[in-house]
């Protein structure tokens, strides 16, 4: 599951490498449609989901890997973050993986006109709590098309439930 992956090319790359049972969720139907058009017939191989991640219901579907590059840090209120984590607990298979990318401790305070929450690995792990075993983390600078650098924190966990 690629959270916020609307116009991302991650799904293209995974399909090209032979991965199956892929899913993408984005709040923007236009972003999903853009990627479906880009993928053409290959789009039929992907499960597409449009909606707000804090209110989404995947039903009985379970995922081996949950990937979020830059959605979670937009959840600035505790209730939204709790709803997100509860959904991850429901949707990721036991012993599955969660890969998160958020703005790091020195990252921007807002993005696209919206406030964000910055994280270090301990704070992010605290948000997820028991049941998530931290396997590693890394700080990296992302060079934006605008010519600036944004600090990102990448964390990967294994669901231990």
PLM regions: where:
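Class I (Rossmann-like) S-adenosyl-L-methionine-dependent methyltransferase catalytic domain
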Residues: 1-61, 75-91, 96-161
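Conserved acidic residues
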Residues: 64
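Short catalytic micro-motifs in class I SAM-dependent methyltransferases
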Residues: 70-74
């Amino acid at each position: 599951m690629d959270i916020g992956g609307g116009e991302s090319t991650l799904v293209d790359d995974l399909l090209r490498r032979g991965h199956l049972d892929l899913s993408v969720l984005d709040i923007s139907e236009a972003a999903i449609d853009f990627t479906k058009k880009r993928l053409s017939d290959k789009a039929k191989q992907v499960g597409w989901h449009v909606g707000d991640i804090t209110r989404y219901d995947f039903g009985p579907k379970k995922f081996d890997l949950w990937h979020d590059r830059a959605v979670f840090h937009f959840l600035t209120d505790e209730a939204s973050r709790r709803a997100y984590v509860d959904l991850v607990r429901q949707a990721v298979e036991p012993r599955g993986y969660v890969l998160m990318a958020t703005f790091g401790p020195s990252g921007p305070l807002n993005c696209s006109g919206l406030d964000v929450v910055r994280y270090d690995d301990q704070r992010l792990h605290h948000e997820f709590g028991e049941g998530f075993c931290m396997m590693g983390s890394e700080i990296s600078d992302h060079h934006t098309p605008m010519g600036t650098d944004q600090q990102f924190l990448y964390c990967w966990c294994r669901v231990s439930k």
